[in-house]
Amino acid sequence: MKNFYFLILILVFSPLHVFSEEVFLSLKKNKVNVRYGPSFDSPIKFVYKKINLPIKQIDKKENFRRIIDLKNNSGWIHVSQLKKINSLIPLEDKILFKKPSIFSKPLAKIKKGRVLLVKKCNENWCKVKTKKIEGWIDINNLWGKTPIIKKN
């Protein structure tokens, strides 16, 4: 009976979050087919036309990944169309700063929904890049993966 309670305690207090870590990927090309099922024989559901768009992987089967996007569209994409480059979409308008501080020089206003490539992140800020400009945004209200780099 003691073993049973011990097992229950282990299951309750074990770090289950390891199994539930979100996997974000980005679209590799400007045109990516999303299918109804995990096969090239499966019909095309819709087509993305945005390189680097961040999407969340929710399942996998062989060489296909089931994904969901910011607008809750879902389907299957072949791995050849995906990459692990980190990208983000702001869920609200953001100010791009020269340094990771609100007291730094503002460089630009980033509109909600714009795809940004992530260079690096710390606990509160991400250094991001567009086609024309690079700077820092705060990490609140973003869709995508923010790889936290902790200071030693």
Indicate residue ranges for each PLM-predicted region:
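Positively charged n-region of N-terminal signal peptides that target proteins for export
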Residues: 1-5
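Soluble catalytic regions of membrane-associated enzymes that act on cell-envelope
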Residues: 9-10
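N-terminal signal peptide c-region/cleavage motif recognized by signal peptidases
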Residues: 13-15
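Boundary regions of SH3-family modules and the immediately adjacent low-complexity/disordered segments
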Residues: 21-29, 38-50, 54-62, 68-105, ...
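Acidic, glycine-rich flexible loop segments
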Residues: 111-112
